[in-house]
Amino acid sequence: LVGALGAVDLTGYSCTRLSVTMNSTTDFMSSVSGDSTNPTLVETTTSFYHATLGAATPNGINSVLFAVYPDLPYDSWVTVGLEGVPNAGIGEAAVATVQSADNPWTTNFDPGFGQPGGNISIDDPIGGAWYALNGDANGIAGDDLKVLVGQFTTDGDLSGQLYCQVFIEGD
């Protein structure tokens, strides 16, 4: 990204979208989860950019606001197939998160109010996740066989590993 977007300068930042590729158009991406045995990590060598109106998930991001808040499309978030407010009319539903008291990964990743975010480390004994419920349209692979699981904007190096739950053919 280059230059100022409203009051925010994202020069030197990259915005990366991660998707899980499936084998069938009807495969269902249920969750990205982690615990001490099967950790999920999304890390940067610096911090993650978070827009003031952004959140840990894109559930409340309305593209109507992009003209007034030009940095909002570059907010960092985790998802299951959504890029913004879910469209219930086509069967989409909000992405949910769960975290343990000992590892508040959601709060570490998105501290709120546009503050820089830390790494996602879901690696404690209890674990955590972001997920959609089976049957939510946003989790279905579709014709491109992909489901978006996150957008990460950083001026550092991005790395990690994801532990994903997929229902083959939706079962």
Give the predicted meaning of each segment.
Residues 1-171:
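Non-catalytic macromolecular-recognition regions in eukaryotic signaling proteins
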